[in-house]
Amino acid sequence: MRIALIDGEHYPDVNRWALEKLNVECAVFIGGMEKIGSIEDVERALNVKLYHDKDPFKALEKALEENDVEEVIDLSDEPVMTPELRFRIASYLLKRGIAYKGADFEFRPKEWIKLEVPSINIIGTGKRVGKTAIGGFVGRTLKERYRIVIVTMGRGGPEKPEIIRGDKITITPEFLVKIAEQGRHAASDHFEDALTAGVPTIGCRRCGGGLAGFTFLDVVKEGIEVAKTLKPELIVLEGSGASFANVLSDGFITVVSALQGERIKTYMYPLRISLADIVVVTMVEEVSEGEKIKRIIKEINPDADVHLTRFAPRLIGNVEGKAIVLTTSQESAKKMAKELERKGIEIAGYSGNLANRGRLREEMNRFNYDTVIVELKAGAVDVAIREALSNGKKVVFLDNEPVNVDGKNLKSAIKKLAERILHDKGG
């Protein structure tokens, strides 16, 4: 059935006229009192059940609990129904698989997939928020107790799901160059997770991403079927950019960058946050700044376990001689270079241009180095690693390890989430 959202900026008889035209059986009062005497006047005029509360979301929640709702029609308008409120309502409804339609807009949810195998869905609020680093960290943490498979999706992912046995093979620079020479994206997330987590990974392709984070096309469902053949105790799904797999998992981890600030309460970022059991705020330089973002997150999702973190360099391999550091942003390259210097590594230079292949080549040619320390991102393989190996240089991979700055323990929280999921699933 359909229900409608109405307000007190419309006269009650106008609301009744619209509800009759649209054959709507009940309504939720959003607010506004200019053209009504009282809420009781509206109830008497409508001839349908009216849900109302000081908090319109509580009224909407009750309406959804008591009715089998497939679509919500928005008959409200400014100033009661602001664009920000509409996006909050859209986020609220799409999370529940309910369509939301207004005069000139329509949001329809992608069908949620439910799995028999226990699963955790890792989603991000944008690109470069550290989602893959968190995915690798989750894999490393949980493989201590469970058989884990990570299913990734990406804009450079394979057309058919591809298995990388990170638990059985060593991901070397030479191996990745051979992959790139075959015309494949060797810096895709399933290669990175196999490298950093040491677990089996399944790479999938996706194209397009909507406001809510659903993809236009992907092969994740097929990837999950491939993952099942490995008999995992737990499947970890990892999103791509601001998009994520439409799997209604048993647990959600949402990754937010501190650099996003108040933006996370706009548009449909609240949907991603409202799904979360754990929210990881990355790139927190000042705890006070992180606390501001934490308050925003708690307003959206009071039950979320929020962790304020920064990234510390974790090297996969041993550095020899002078090293250069290559990442996807100048700021992160500078920070990582400084931290590595404090650990006694001689840094000859750094670059944040992994995503700009032309500039990356120019900068590498200017440096005098023995070892390349590189994130497995963007042009890492087809430019940085290929260039280093052709010149007889050593390659060491750089992973970003989340470190709590708030006194909490993210690793412990992830273990507890997995324990709860396996317990609830009877595992």
Swiss-Prot record:
EC nos: 6.5.1.9
Recorded GO CC terms: cytoplasm
Compartment(s) of residence: Cytoplasm
Catalytic activity: (2R)-2,3-bisphosphoglycerate + ATP + H(+) = cyclic (2R)-2,3-bisphosphoglycerate + ADP + phosphate
Keyword Nuclease attributed: no
GO function terms (MF aspect): ATP binding; cyclic 2,3-diphosphoglycerate synthetase activity; ligase activity
InterPro entries with a match to the protein in the record: Cyc_diphosphoglycerate_synth, P-loop_NTPase
Disulfide bonds: none
Chain's gene name: cpgS
Task performed by this protein: Catalyzes the formation of cyclic 2,3-diphosphoglycerate (cDPG) by formation of an intramolecular phosphoanhydride bond at the expense of ATP.
Gene Ontology terms describing biological process: gluconeogenesis
Record organism: Pyrococcus abyssi (strain GE5 / Orsay)
Protein name (database record): Cyclic 2,3-diphosphoglycerate synthetase
